[in-house]
Amino acid sequence: LGIEPSGVFGPTNGRWSMIVRPGVVTGGNFLWGGCGLAAAVAAIEELSGRTCVWATAQYLSYARTGETMDVDVTLAVVGHQITQARAVCRVGDREILTVNAAVGERPFEYAHSFVKMPDVPPPSALKQRAHRSDVSNTIHEKMEERFVIGRELEELDEIPNDGRTLMWARIPDVIDGVDTATLAVLGDFV
């Protein structure tokens, strides 16, 4: 992502900056939303020293390739185990996105997943997703995307389906060391 600290104003607020560059943008040459969320989460985690457990973003505008995006972080409530945080991402005076997040962890002796992974073919059994346009210098150039359920562009017709899509997605450069920022980038498909 290329996000770097650019000013810490105290224990509960600080600023990070990143240049929106090729590789973190869409085909329209603006910041991929998941990369914006990832930048905010990375800054929140760095300031708080805690791992993100939940985050949501509201996208308000676009950050174009070559622009510098500042990420202003505020730790609104610092609890013993959980911190509530906010990040406002701007290019100049223009707000790009706002992020609210909870970071930290609470000891709990039980672990459970409430969602069962669907029974689907492995990625190696599926073909790489086709794109309508050139993906050079976009986030899609860095990803492998394979449809399990869904229709490729050439399969679209006038007949609607149930709207359900299942897809394998990964960033091969980040196979080892997947963190919450990486999951935020991939989460933009949801």
Region locations from a protein language model:
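Terminal targeting signals and extreme-terminal segments of soluble enzymes
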Residues: 1-190
